[in-house]
């Protein structure tokens, strides 16, 4: 089994939080935000009001809000687009790319971790950070969205080796 982990430096994390976060995202994304729970994440798109494709990303539940795992090159545009739609919604939108990273590891390693399940998009917490089986295809492996300060200790405890 390959225990390698890769820090996906081309990914960024945006956090949407607040009283209206769920309804706010439900009105903007192409997938049903109600599918996103502590145990399930989804792959979705952000569309224009006319239904034209803008961006795609993974949404995962985190605490009282939602992580958006997106391409780093598009994160500023996604952040601006979300803020454009914010209007009077009671939401806070934060770009956490300097604080959180996305670490990726293989499907076999994912299955060896306690509490994992062989279900696309299945999500469980390692401490308080989500581990997600890629919702698009299990062969893409799993992702751990984690605070940079906890990264190396968590990799050690999960028996993952950083292959930069």
Question: For each predicted feature, which ranges?
Answer:
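Basic, glycine/lysine-rich polyanion-binding surfaces/domains
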Residues: 1-164
């Amino acid at each position: 089994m390959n225990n390698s982990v890769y820090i996906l430096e081309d990914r960024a994390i945006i956090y949407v939080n607040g009283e209206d976060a769920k309804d706010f995202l439900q009105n903007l994304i192409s997938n049903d935000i109600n599918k996103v729970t502590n145990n399930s994440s989804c792959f979705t798109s952000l569309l224009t009001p006319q239904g034209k494709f803008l961006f795609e990303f993974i949404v995962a539940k985190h605490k009282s809000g939602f992580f958006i795992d997106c391409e780093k090159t598009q994160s500023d545009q996604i952040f601006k687009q979300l803020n454009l739609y914010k209007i009077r919604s009671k939401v806070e939108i934060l770009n956490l790319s300097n604080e959180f990273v996305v670490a990726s590891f293989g499907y076999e390693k994912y299955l060896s971790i306690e509490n994992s399940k062989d279900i696309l998009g299945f999500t469980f917490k390692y401490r308080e950070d989500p581990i997600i089986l890629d919702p698009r295809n299990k062969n893409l492996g799993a992702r751990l969205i984690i605070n940079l300060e906890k990264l190396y200790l968590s990799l050690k405890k999960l028996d993952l080796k950083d292959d930069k």
